């Protein structure tokens, strides 16, 4: 029987989370936070075996212009203050306020201009000099802040430099690798890479080959690109792990690794897959980690992988984008779908509607079509081809409304979104931050409307209340009346410098009340019982 090289075993999200958290119940003597930090360093097996520890960041050819290098610490701090940038780390490269001084080739500068990007955003002002200097970086920025260019432009420069010095041979590469939590985000990032690579070719520079390495696509076509030699790979964890396990691609030459939406990667249970990827590195690489939120579990994850990292924060981790007007409305469950039509009148298209489950997405989509609204819908139950087609129609402006589950909230770039409607308040505040980050991008103001009712837990609503307070938004009466344990300990928390939950980053509760931590413990307990008794024991599978 012929073995299908394109086969990738699918492990459901629930099972991945159960595998990760099973240790919580198997080792009851450990404290809660100890379970988050007891894993080995994020290094390759070879590095661990040889006892290698990298203590210094990689060096690069890039240096900022002389007038930038001559800036005093006071001048640099003033620029950061003006751009609302917070930094942390040793020997931090200076911020640069224009792309010209970053020494990008003229084709890339022209492409930026053609895309209407005249000036760098705050994350780019500080993040690009950090990455170009070869430093490991933790980038904390709300979705829509322009963080994609912070890693795309430097990795194109690195790949171009390597290609000019010693061209990539057949089967070699990649030089740079990006790992994304979803196929949609990977495809979007790949498209950005291709646009800038094409601009270089038009100007006579060597052709850089890039690869989109995701599931749902025939692996053979991806391997054909690898065989020719590849400079840049944008991948999802599952397909990348499978190709590496089959020894179809090597990371021996990889110098730059980016983990985009790192909080989502860990939340979706991909941490072990990423550790598997690290096993394939043979030498030191520059590592970049980007996240919209920064709970303790991500901090631990980052410190095990990065060397003397520079943290660049353009908005406190967990706080929502200040360019979004957040409106929270109490709507009874049975009235939500009718009230939705009224909400759509608040702004002109395009509008995003987020739901917690697939059935609601389908129901709302059908209802809007019956009412004459030009709408499309995506969720995890739809084919990849159908999802891509719906997204393309929405992006092209041929459809006014996109109804989606959180599949669409993982970093997808929909320009000029006027309004985001949360048909359901998500169970985790991190998802709320990701969702409303679809609007209010690139300095433009957007609106986010969220429906709440008695179906939401009080802890979730307290998280929302505190986030609204931090973002200086109006607090609706139904939330203002809520008082939780955080109200009594706010003074102590501020004095200690610790805000909210150490596990998930929520602002309205502590780890002892964390619903996310409790849920994952429950999943682990449930899975361990199933393992002990099997499907033939009590309550066997029917």
From Swiss-Prot:
| GO MF annotation: an example | RNA binding
Outline the extent of the Helicase ATP-binding domain.
Answer: 128-312
> For the motif DEAD box, what are the positions?
260-263
List UniProt keywords, sorted A-Z.
ATP-binding, Helicase, Hydrolase, Metal-binding, Nucleotide-binding, RNA-binding, Zinc, Zinc-finger
The UniProt record lists the Helicase C-terminal domain at 323-483
Q: Which PROSITE patterns match?
A: HELICASE_ATP_BIND_1, HELICASE_CTER, Q_MOTIF
Spell out the reaction equation it catalyses.
ATP + H2O = ADP + phosphate + H(+)
**Which GO biological process annotations does it have?**
mRNA splicing, via spliceosome
UniProt binding sites for ATP: 141-148
What Enzyme Commission number(s) appear in the record?
Answer: 3.6.4.13
Could you tell me which InterPro entries the record lists for this protein?
Answer: DEAD/DEAH_box_helicase_dom (IPR011545), DEADc_DDX41 (IPR044113), Helicase_ATP-bd (IPR014001), Helicase_C-like (IPR001650), P-loop_NTPase (IPR027417), RNA_helicase_DEAD_Q_motif (IPR014014)
Does the entry feature the keyword Zinc, yes or no? yes
Q: Where is this motif: Q motif?
A: 97-125
Q: Which intervals hold the zinc fingers (CCHC-type)?
A: 499-516
Its family remark reads:
Belongs to the DEAD box helicase family. DDX41 subfamily.
Q: What is known of its domains?
A: The Q motif is unique to and characteristic of the DEAD box family of RNA helicases and controls ATP binding and hydrolysis.
Question: What is the name of the protein in this document?
Answer: Putative DEAD-box ATP-dependent RNA helicase 43
Q: Which organism is it from?
A: Arabidopsis thaliana
Query: In the UniProt record, what gene is named as encoding this protein?
Result: RH43
């Amino acid at each position: 029987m012929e073995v299908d090289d394109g086969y990738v075993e699918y492990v459901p999200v629930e099972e991945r989370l159960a595998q990760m958290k099973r240790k919580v119940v198997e080792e009851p003597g450990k404290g809660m936070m100890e379970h988050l930090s007891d894993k080995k360093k994020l290094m390759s097996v070879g590095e661990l075996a040889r006892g290698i520890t990298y203590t210094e960041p990689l060096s690069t050819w890039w240096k900022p212009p002389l007038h930038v290098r001559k800036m005093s610490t006071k001048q640099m701090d003033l620029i950061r203050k003006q751009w609302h940038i917070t930094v942390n780390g040793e020997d931090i490269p200076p911020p640069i306020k224009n792309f010209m001084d970053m020494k990008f080739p003229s084709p890339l500068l022209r492409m930026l201009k053609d895309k209407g990007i005249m000036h760098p955003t705050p994350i780019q002002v500080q993040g690009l000099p950090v990455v170009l200097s070869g430093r490991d970086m933790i980038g904390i920025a709300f979705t829509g802040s322009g963080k994609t260019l912070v890693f795309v432009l430097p990795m194109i420069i690195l790949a171009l430099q390597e290609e000019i010095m010693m061209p990539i041979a057949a089967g070699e590469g990649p030089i740079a690798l990006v790992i994304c939590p979803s196929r949609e985000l990977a495809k979007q990032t790949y498209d950005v890479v291709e646009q800038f690579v094409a601009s270089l070719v038009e100007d006579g520079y060597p052709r850089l080959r890039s690869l989109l390495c995701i599931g749902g696509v025939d692996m053979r076509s991806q391997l054909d690109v690898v065989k020719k030699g590849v400079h840049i790979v944008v991948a999802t964890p599952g397909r990348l792990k499978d190709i590496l396990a089959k020894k179809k691609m090597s990371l021996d030459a990889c110098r730059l690794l980016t983990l985009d939406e790192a909080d989502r990667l860990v939340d979706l249970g991909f941490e072990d897959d990423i550790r598997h990827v690290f096993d394939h590195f043979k030498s030191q690489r520059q590592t970049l980690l980007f996240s919209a939120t920064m709970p303790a579990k991500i901090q631990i994850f980052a410190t095990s992988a990065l060397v003397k990292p520079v943290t660049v924060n353009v908005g406190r981790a967990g706080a929502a984008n200040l360019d979004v007007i957040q409106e929270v409305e109490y709507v009874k469950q049975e009235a939500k779908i009718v009230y939705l039509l009224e909400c759509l009148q608040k702004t002109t298209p395009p509008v995003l509607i987020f739901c917690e489950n697939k059935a609601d997405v389908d129901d709302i989509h059908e209802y809007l079509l019956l009412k004459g609204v030009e709408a499309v819908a995506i969720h995890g139950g739809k084919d990849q081809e159908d999802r891509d087609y719906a997204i393309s129609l929405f992006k092209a402006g041929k459809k006014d409304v996109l109804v989606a589950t959180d599949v669409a909230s993982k970093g997808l770039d929909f320009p000029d979104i006027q309004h985001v409607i949360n048909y359901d308040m998500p169970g985790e505040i991190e998802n709320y931050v990701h969702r409303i980050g679809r609007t209010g991008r690139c300095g433009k103001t957007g609106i986010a409307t969220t429906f709440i009712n008695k179906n939401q837990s009080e802890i979730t609503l307290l998280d929302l209340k505190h986030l609204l307070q931090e973002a200086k938004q109006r607090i609706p009466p139904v939330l203002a009346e809520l008082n939780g344990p955080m109200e009594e300990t706010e003074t102590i928390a501020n004095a200690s410098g610790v805000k909210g939950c150490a596990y998930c980053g929520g602002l309205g509760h502590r780890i002892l009340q964390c619903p996310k931590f409790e849920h994952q413990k429950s999943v682990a307990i449930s899975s361990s019982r199933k393992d002990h008794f099997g499907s033939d024991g009590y309550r066997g599978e029917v």
